Structures are given as C-alpha cells and as structure tokens.
UniProtKB/Swiss-Prot annotation:
Keyword Aminoacyl-tRNA synthetase: no
GO cellular component, one term: ribonucleoprotein complex
Gene3D superfamilies listed in its UniProt record: Ribosomal protein S11
Organism in which the protein naturally occurs: Bartonella tribocorum (strain CIP 105476 / IBS 506)
HAMAP family tied to this protein: Ribosomal_uS11
Gene Ontology terms for molecular function: rRNA binding; structural constituent of ribosome
Family statement drawn from the similarity comment of this UniProt entry: Belongs to the universal ribosomal protein uS11 family.
Protein name (database record): Small ribosomal subunit protein uS11
UniProt record, GO biological process: translation
Coiled coil found in the keyword field: no
C-alpha cells in the first residue's frame, strides 16, 4: 500500500503588531519564543538550534544570535512591539534582550518570571572548583 505524500504546510503571514517574548535562559542553553497575546507561538529559536554545541550554547553571544534569528522570523509576521518575560539564571538574559532592541522592536515592558522557591526542593550540591 503506497503511503500518501505528506503535504508541506506553508506558513501563512499573520499580521500581529504586538506580542510577548519568552526568554528562557538556563545554565546550558537559551530558548527564545515569541507569542501573540493569547500565547500562540509565532516564532522560536534557541542557541542549540543555531548550531552552537556543548558549552558554547550557554554563552551570551549564542543567545544574541538566537534572539536575532527569532526576531527576524517575527518581523515577517508584521510584529513591531514586544513585552519581554525573562526566566532563568543563565548568561544569555541581557544579551538576548539587547539583540531584540537592536533589531528594531519597541519593548513595552520587561518582567522577570523566574520561579523562586519558598523553601521547596533541596538544591543541587555546590560546585567546588
């Protein structure tokens, strides 16, 4: 039995003027997702998706490259202004934010939504170098 050819779905151009950027910056990687106001993903990128491997994924430069790529994808959909939600303790937080500003987005607000435990789970052991 012949398998049906999978149809390639073309991305339709959505005219969305404002959105929300979720910057998730961990110690190992930086993930950036741009959504509309309802939370539907418009564009995403990460340092690993841009070809950085291993320890280079966690650098500020990798976060900057990922943010610029994600911003270009969102600008194709007509996005101009952004709210920023930053989550996590990683090195790419500020550099991703600066990259979004340099591309030409108007940033209306910046929120830090890093979850802070009120004495929850026991943390990882401290590194001794």
């Amino acid at each position: 039995m012949a398998k049906e050819a999978t149809r390639v779905r073309r991305r339709e151009r959505k005219n969305i003027s404002s959105g929300v950027v979720h910057i998730n910056s961990t110690f190992n990687n930086t993930m950036i997702t741009i959504t509309d106001a309802q939370g539907n993903a418009i564009a995403w990128s990460s340092a690993g998706a841009q070809g950085f491997k291993g320890a280079r994924k966690s650098t500020p430069f990798a976060a900057q490259v990922a943010a610029e790529d994600c911003a270009r994808k969102a600008q194709e959909h007509g996005m101009r202004s952004l709210e920023v939600e930053v989550c996590g303790p990683g090195a790419g937080r500020e550099s991703a934010l600066r990259a979004l500003q340099s591309v030409g987005f108007v940033i209306t607000s910046i929120r830090d939504v890093t979850p802070i435990p009120h004495n929850g789970c026991r943390p990882r052991k401290r590194r001794r170098v």
